[in-house]
Structures are given as structure tokens and as C-alpha cells.
């Protein structure tokens, strides 16, 4: 699991090298055993003033290449809890108008179950 989309930041769509790095990261996630973690993406690619647009665009870009079955939710303890509560960390995925309920189920629990070899 490559957490935090590999450490992307707010410059993702404004800096060419950052986009190249992100595209390389997405390519890595095409491999069977590699997933991209979303837990702190809202902290890194969004803020309470500007909203979730950059974070959402990053998820759309990744999902268009690897699908929602390669995006996973993690715990991210304890770092991000200094900035956001768990409710706020989950909110940016819950409010994403382009992610279906079935895709949210993949992100929040089904992909984790598959990764760790658990059955439903």
C-alpha cells in the first residue's frame, strides 16, 4: 500500500514534475499487489478553504487508469488527527459526487479485505 498517494501535495496539477511523479505512481499501482492509500489525501490535496477539488481530480485520474478496486482506506494514525478528525478524513470521500456507493464500499472496506486475504 502506497499511502497518501505517494506524498502528493497541493501543487499536483500545477507543477509538471509532480504530475509526472503521480502518473508513475499510478503505473506502479497497475501491479496486482500494489494499492494506493487515500487516508490523508484530503489533508495533502485539499484544505478547508478551497475544498476538495484537487483531491477529487487526483482520485478521478487514478481511478480512470487503475479503477476503484486499487484504492484503499487506511488508518493513518496518529499524524493526520492533529489536522483533521476521522469524520473529516472520511467526509471528502463520502461527499465525492462521482464515486458511487459500490465504489465507496471498495475503498472503505472491500479492497482492504481483498488485500489482507479476508472473505466478506
PLM ranges: what are they?
Residues 1-72:
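Catalytic pocket-lining loop regions of alpha/beta-barrel enzymes
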Residues 33-35, 77, 89:
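Bulky hydrophobic/aromatic packing residues
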Residues 61, 65-72, 81-120:
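Mid-to-C-terminal alpha-helical segments outside catalytic/metal-binding sites
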